[in-house]
């Protein structure tokens, strides 16, 4: 199911969206390729090769999450991002770490279902067309009549005609899981009745709609009939086990220093609960058992207060690849504004174009934006590239507000405009703490 890239191709693709951090890109590219290499091995060697989990160390806003998220999108793998601080030790109120794997399986099921729906899209569309014709001319109409109406249907002549269609009533099957009291987000893996009984007794409802609007619900209905749910679940479990990526952010927040505070004990408990997941265990989900042995875990943290060595030694050993991400320089911030395919500058120009406002941002304005972001990061708190969004919003605040009234006009943003919009705020440290 996953798309296969060489490490060089993976890095090249990541370069299109993320500036710098080549060491981190190389590490994740190799980890991704190693999964494909493992799949080429014969049993029993294939089972013995474990993923080399990664620990990314670096300040906020330098691309840790971006690299992992883009990697998953690139490969088509099921991906789940969680924050370590959201979980509690088993036995305490809160989410337990096994929910990470259940969420991953849910995402895998959605991915596989979408892939299967694409494969049967044409067949589902043909079946939906037949049902629209049934509603228009009746099931007993002659082939010549049906062909005549089919031609009109395809040419759009009947789009506004009202028809009655019968589709599945999805509301009758909505409750598939139960929340466990006192544990928000944790769900018992219980299949709903329709899953157990298959397609028996599915309710339908009659809807009155136009021909144009009838196609989507009918295609959805026909797709569900054509899909083999059992096959989807089996493939989703296999994909989650072999291709799943779990990104655990803020892992430094559960690293403990010496000290016997109860909070430290709880944080250590979360680490101990993570251990079997990262090492390899079997988790029960509502779709079946899933083994975590070959899921790739990428953990990340700033480690401002704590150090990687403050993590439990057992957990450190299960994150063998360490990558340090560098703080962003002025040049990095300048490149982030302009080079990525969906850079901030391109985003704002495209947004203003929807209001028929032409936005031109000069090179000296880009330099000024980067300078201000670097200065604020140094003086207040270093939040990396995220500072650029704050600065850009402030600079374009007036234009964004008045854009609907200025259709057909052009605005030129230069360094003077940037300094005028933000200069006084940036100079006043106390004020900029709250606004920038």
UniProtKB/Swiss-Prot annotation:
GO terms for biological process: protein unfolding; proteolysis involved in protein catabolic process. CDD domains: RecA-like_HslU. Signal peptide: none annotated. GO terms for molecular function: ATP binding; ATP hydrolysis activity; peptidase activity; proteasome-activating activity. ATP binds at residues 19, 61-65, 249, 314, 386. SUPFAM superfamilies: P-loop containing nucleoside triphosphate hydrolases (SSF52540). InterPro entries: AAA+_ATPase, ATP-dep_Clp_protease_ClpX, ATPase_AAA_core, Clp_ATPase_C, HslU, P-loop_NTPase. It is found in: Cytoplasm. It holds the Pfam family AAA_2. Keywords: ATP-binding, Chaperone, Cytoplasm, Nucleotide-binding, Stress response. ATPase subunit of a proteasome-like degradation complex; this subunit has chaperone activity. The binding of ATP and its subsequent hydrolysis by HslU are essential for unfolding of protein substrates subsequently hydrolyzed by HslV. HslU recognizes the N-terminal part of its protein substrates and unfolds these before they are guided to HslV for hydrolysis. Belongs to the ClpX chaperone family. HslU subfamily. A double ring-shaped homohexamer of HslV is capped on each side by a ring-shaped HslU homohexamer. The assembly of the HslU/HslV complex is dependent on binding of ATP. This is ATP-dependent protease ATPase subunit HslU. It comes from Bartonella tribocorum (strain CIP 105476 / IBS 506). The gene is hslU.
């Amino acid at each position: 199911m996953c798309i296969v890239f060489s490490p060089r191709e993976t890095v090249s693709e990541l370069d299109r969206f993320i500036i710098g951090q080549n060491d981190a890109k190389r590490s994740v590219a190799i980890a991704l390729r190693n999964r494909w290499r493992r799949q080429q091995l014969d049993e029993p060697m294939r089972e013995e090769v474990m993923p080399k989990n990664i620990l990314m160390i670096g300040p906020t806003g330098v691309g840790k999450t971006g690299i992992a998220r883009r990697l998953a999108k690139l490969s088509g793998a099921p991906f789940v991002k969680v924050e370590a601080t959201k979980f509690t030790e088993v036995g305490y109120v809160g989410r337990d770490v096994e929910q990470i794997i259940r969420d991953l399986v849910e995402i895998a099921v959605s991915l596989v279902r979408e892939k299967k729906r694409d494969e049967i899209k044409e067949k589902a569309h043909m079946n939906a067309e037949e049902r629209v014709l049934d509603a228009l001319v009746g099931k007993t109409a002659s082939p010549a009549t049906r062909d005549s109406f089919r031609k009109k249907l395809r040419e759009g002549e009947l789009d506004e005609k009202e028809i009655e269609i019968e589709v599945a009533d999805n509301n009758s099957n909505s409750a598939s899981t139960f929340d466990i009291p006192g544990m928000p987000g944790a769900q018992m893996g219980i299949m709903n009745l329709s899953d157990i009984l298959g397609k028996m007794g599915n309710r339908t409802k009659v809807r009155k709609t136009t021909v144009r609007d009838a196609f989507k619900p009918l295609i959805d209905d026909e797709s569900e009939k054509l899909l083999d749910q059992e096959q989807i679940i089996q493939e989703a479990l296999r994909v989650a086990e072999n291709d799943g990526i779990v990104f655990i952010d803020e892992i430094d927040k559960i690293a403990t220093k010496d000290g016997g505070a109860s909070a430290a004990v709880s944080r250590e408990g979360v680490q101990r609960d993570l251990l079997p997941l990262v090492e390899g265990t079997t988790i029960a989900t509502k779709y079946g058992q899933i083994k975590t042995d070959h899921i790739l875990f990428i953990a990340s943290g700033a480690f401002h207060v704590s150090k990687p060595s403050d993590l439990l030694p057992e957990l450190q050993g299960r994150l063998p690849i360490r990558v340090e991400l560098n703080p962003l320089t002025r040049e990095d911030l300048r490149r982030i504004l302009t080079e990525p395919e969906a850079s901030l500058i391109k985003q704002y120009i495209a947004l203003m174009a929807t209001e028929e406002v032409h936005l031109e941002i000069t090179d000296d304005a880009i330099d000024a934006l980067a300078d201000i972001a670097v200065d604020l990061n140094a003086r207040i708190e270093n939040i990396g590239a995220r500072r650029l969004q704050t600065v850009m919003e402030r600079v374009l605040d007036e234009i964004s507000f008045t854009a609907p009234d200025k259709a057909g006009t052009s605005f030129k943003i230069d360094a003077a405009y940037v300094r005028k919009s933000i200069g006084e705020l940036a100079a006043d440290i106390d004020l900029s703490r709250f606004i920038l």
